[in-house]
Amino acid sequence: MKIDIVSVFPEYFEVLNLSLLGKAQSKGLVEVTAHNLRDWTHDVHHSVDDTPVGGGAGMVMKPEVWSECLDELLQLEPAVIENTENIEDSADSFDTGDSCDTTDSDTAQSSAGPENSEKTDIAPSSAGPVLIFPNPSAPLFTQQDATELSHADHLLFGCGRYEGYDARIPQYYRTQGIDVREYSIGDYVLNGGEVAVSVMLEAITRLLPGFMGNAASIVEESYTGDNALLEHRQYTKPAEWRGIKVPDVLLSGNHAKVDRFRRDEALAKTDELRPDLIEALDCTKLDKADRKTLMALGWEVSAAHPRKR
C-alpha cells in the first residue's frame, strides 16, 4: 500500500517509523511519504492560507496551493475552472466521516465531508487513489471504514490547519472522479489534522495481511466483524495480584467454557457501555446462548434486531 501525507508539519509523521508500522515499511508492506504543503507555494513567505470569504476569525487554507500539490501526487493534469456553476454544491451532502479532530476550525480535523455520510460496504477500488481529509464536521471514522480502506492501493491524506481547508478542494476532486473521503475521529477539535491522520492510518494499516505478528489477535477486537461488540477483559499472570483474582473459568482449561465466558462478558460490557451496538446486532446470527444472555440483560431478541425491554 502506498500512503502519501500532506501537511505543513511533515516532521510530525516521523513517529510512523516506530513499532509495527515501522517494521511494515521495512518489510515493504507499506510505503509512507510525508510531504510539506509549503513546497508547492511560490511566494517568499510560503503562504498556504488566507482570510475567510464573508469574514470571520482565523485563516483558511488556500485551494491554489492544495491543487498544485494534489494534482501532482494524484498524477492529474492541472486544470483551472473558470466557471463553477455546473459543479453541484457539495455542502448539501457528505460522503463519509464525522468527529472533530482537525484544526482550530471544523474543517481541519478528521472526518469525512458532506459527501461521505452515505456509508457503503463496498471497498474502494484498488486501482484508484483515495483522497482523505480529517474534518470534525464530517461523519465518524469507524472500524468498518478502516476495513474498507485497507483494500486500497493508494491513500492520500490531507492535513488541515487553522480554520481548515477551502471547501471547494474536496468538491473539485470529486468532480474529477477521485474517491474523496472526509472523516472525523470524535466529537472534539484538535489544532490540526495530523493527529487524526495518524489515528486513521494506524487503524487501516494494521489490517493489512502480514502487518500483525499474529493475525488472530485482531479477530475478536472491539468493533470487529459483522456483529461487532466491545471486547471482553484481558488478563495475564499471575493468577492473583494484590488480592484480585483472575476469573476461575479462565484457569479451567475448558476452552468451550472460556469462550462462552468471554462472549457473555463482551455482551454484558457492550450492553452497559454501548447499547447502540447491541441494537445493531443481527438476531439471526446469534446462537442460543447469546440470546439467553441478552434476555437476561433485558433485551428482546425475537425480532430482526435486539430491542431493550
What are these regions (language model features)?
Residues M1-L76, A256-D271, D276-L277:
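N-terminal nucleotide/polyanion-binding subdomain common to many enzyme families
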Residues K62-F94, D104, N116-R161, P209:
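S-adenosyl-L-methionine/SAH cofactor-binding core of RNA-modifying enzymes
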Residues L20, Q144-D145, I169:
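A short acidic, amphipathic alpha-helical/loop segment
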Residues T84, D89, D98, L229, ...:
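SAM-dependent methyltransferases
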